[in-house]
Structures are given as C-alpha cells and as structure tokens.
C-alpha cells in the first residue's frame, strides 16, 4: 500500500536528464517482465539519477551502484528508488507526474530512509524538477 504525501509548491530546481540517465533507465526497463513494471523502473531510475545529480551539486557523496535500485533482483521484486548517501544511509527518490499534488511512497520505502527527494517529470522527459 502506498502512502500519499503532500508535495510542497514553493520551491523547485530544474535539472536536465542526461543521455546516460536515459540509457540506464532503458537498460533497467528492458529487463522487466511487463510494460507496467518497465515504466515504473524507468521512472524510478530517472528519479534516482536526477537525485544523484542534485546531491552531487550540493557536494554530497553518493554511491548509486550500492543502492537497492541498482540491484536487478530487488528492482524486479520491489518498487525501489533509493540512493545511498555514503556514510549515512539511503535516500528515497520518487517521481511524480506534472500537476501531481501528492507523492506515493511504497511501504517498503517508508522505513530506514534518511529522507525523500521528489522529482516531477517535465517536457517529455527532457528534465526533471527537484521539488524542495
């Protein structure tokens, strides 16, 4: 069961989605058994990539490859979009559609997280907006 959380509207930071992020999302999505799961994994992967870029801009060290979202078995079995913040734990990166007023967080991602980064897809996936 997902828990909806209100999304603040006061600040946002637009970040371009790199070709590398699109490529990684495509690779992970193609490994999925259904179109629905592929779309979920694609959006989650883009959210993690943009969350990673955002934290790097802030000078925060991350290890995306140590994240559950980079583990093929966990990615297949769960709705994960985590990013490891080195020395601190996992940050959840969630994507929402344009105009969304809530962000659903799956049960498996509601505990043991440092916090949440919510990104909104804009302009046919050319960039995501980090909602702060």
PLM regions with names:
Residues 1-87, 93-132:
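Nucleic-acid endonuclease domains
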